[in-house]
Regions:
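Electrostatic cytochrome c docking/interface patches
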Residues: 24-55
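Short cysteine/histidine-rich zinc-coordinating motifs and their immediately flanking basic loops
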Residues: 73-77
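C-terminal motif of bacterial Sec signal peptides marking the signal peptidase cleavage site
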Residues: 15-18
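Inter-heme linker and motif-flanking segments adjacent to c-type heme-binding CXXCH motifs
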Residues: 69, 131-134
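Extracytoplasmic electron-transfer domains, predominantly the class I c-type cytochrome c fold
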Residues: 79-132
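Sequence/structural segment immediately N-terminal to covalent heme-attachment motifs in c-type
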Residues: 46-69, 97-99
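Positively charged n-region of N-terminal signal peptides that target proteins for export
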Residues: 1-4
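Sec-dependent N-terminal signal peptides
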Residues: 6-13
Length: 134
């Protein structure tokens, strides 16, 4: 009987392990950054993430959620769903993040923020996104 319970527990653990992790998966590759954005790095100082959190809360959190996981209340109706920024920031350079925030993402509901946010505000959001975890 003990052997049977052990086998059931082990099999259950494998099933749970196989089902986990889907929510934080990201695309295998990111789109290439256009030449006019490639190589850009954040010019702002260490306090930029604090200011970026405020900008993110007002402008990004409705879709991306408070932790950037793509689970904001406005994002639930979107197709495709907003990206998990904690995962994306691990894959992307500052240039990619600045580009996507500035110009949006075709085929998604990610709108361009260039002209709505200042360049410094976009860099502040980039700094804040760098603090997010998957």
């Amino acid at each position: 009987m003990k052997k049977f319970l052990f086998v059931i527990l082990v099999l259950g653990a494998f099933v749970l392990a196989a089902c986990g992790g889907g929510a934080t998966e990201a695309p295998a590759t990111l789109a290439p950054v256009p030449a006019d954005f490639a190589g850009k790095t954040n010019p702002l100082g260490a306090d930029a993430a604090t200011d970026g959190a405020k900008v993110f809360q007002v402008n990004c959190e409705p879709c991306h959620g408070p932790k950037g996981h793509g689970d904001g209340p406005a994002g639930t109706a979107l197709d495709p769903k907003p990206k998990n920024l904690g995962v994306i920031q691990q894959m992307a350079g500052d240039d990619f993040l600045f580009w996507r925030i500035s110009t949006g993402s075709p085929g998604t509901s990610m709108a361009p923020w260039q002209g709505i946010l200042t360049e410094d505000q976009i860099w502040q959001v980039v700094a804040f996104v760098r603090t997010l975890q998957p």
